[in-house]
Each structure stands twice: as structure tokens, then as C-alpha cells.
């Protein structure tokens, strides 16, 4: 005996991308004391474009997303009651965010004008980058570089020995 049904098979739900369009597999997610102000700083210093701001009921930023170059950066306000403390509350950060740019000197000048603290001014480095180090007003450490010279692995290893051990 055969049975027939008039029910249509369930429509397949379109597949979602595990890594959404515009995201990379690693995205920094910063805790800031003053995340809205941090977004404004990153716009001035690094040319960030604001993508999203979600405010918590108490007015703090619970999620912000900006784009710098081809990469996303997520951030939110410090929420110590949830264990989310900023570098300012922790008295520092062991993490450095690296930004690769077309013109390190221009970005360095913009960041300093926007309020970044100079940790190391731009200089040509043995690995082939013109490179600088900054601290933003929210306690996050940044390295910024422009690649200026290709260096072979052998040259790089020799230069690293000389740089670290005095030759």
C-alpha cells in the first residue's frame, strides 16, 4: 500500500557565512574607558569608519564596530561588574595592535595630533618596515608600519641576531 502526501518539503534555509562578509578570522575586541570617545579618536588617528554602535540601557557602549583599512575592530565600554576592565584600570596592556599602512609618517602625525602618546617615533627597521609605536588615550598599545624593503629570511635572521645581541 502506497501513501502519498501533498506537503511540500521544508524550504532550505539559506546558509549563513561562518565568518561574515567584511570580517577576518581574528578581530581585536577592545575594552575602553570611554568607548564612544575611543571611536572618535580612531576616526581621527587612523581614518576609522564607524560601522555599528549599540548602547546598553545605562548609556554605556555595549558593542561598537569600526573599520580601519580592510579590518574590523570591535570595542565596548569598560564594565568592571562583568570583569571587563580597560588598560587604564589595569594600569597597562600586554597586547599590541599592529596596523599596516601606506604611509606610516602621515598616520603617526595624525595619531599624535589626535592625542596618542609617542612610545617610539617612525624609524626604518631591520625587518624591512618603517615602524613606530604609540599608546592611544585609552591605554591600548599600537605599532604602525609601512613595508619599505623586502628582506630575505637569511638577512632577517642575521639582522635579528645583531639587533638583539649587539652583533
Each language-model region and where it sits:
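Short acidic-aromatic low-complexity motifs
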Residues: 32-36
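C-terminal catalytic core of tyrosine-transesterase DNA break-rejoin enzymes
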Residues: 138
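Vicinal oxygen chelate
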Residues: 2-29, 39-40, 46-135, 145-167
Amino acid at each position: 500500500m502506497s501513501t502519498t502526501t501533498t506537503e511540500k518539503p521544508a524550504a532550505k534555509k539559506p546558509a549563513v557565512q561562518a565568518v561574515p562578509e567584511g570580517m577576518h578570522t581574528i578581530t581585536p575586541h577592545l575594552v575602553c574607558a570611554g568607548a564612544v570617545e575611543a571611536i572618535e579618536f580612531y576616526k581621527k588617528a587612523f581614518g576609522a569608519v564607524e560601522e555599528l554602535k549599540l548602547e546598553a540601557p545605562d548609556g554605556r557602549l555595549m558593542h561598537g564596530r569600526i573599520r580601519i583599512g580592510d579590518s574590523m575592530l570591535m570595542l565596548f565600554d569598560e564594565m568592571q561588574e562583568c570583569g571587563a576592565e580597560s588598560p587604564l584600570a589595569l594600569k597597562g596592556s600586554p597586547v599590541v595592535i599592529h596596523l599596516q599602512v601606506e604611509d606610516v609618517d602621515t598616520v603617526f602625525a595624525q595619531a599624535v595630533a589626535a592625542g596618542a602618546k609617542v612610545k617610539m617615533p617612525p624609524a626604518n627597521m631591520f625587518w624591512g618596515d618603517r615602524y613606530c609605536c604609540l599608546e592611544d588615550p585609552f591605554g591600548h598599545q599600537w605599532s604602525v608600519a609601512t613595508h619599505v624593503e623586502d628582506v630575505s629570511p637569511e638577512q632577517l635572521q642575521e639582522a635579528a641576531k645583531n639587533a638583539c645581541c649587539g652583533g
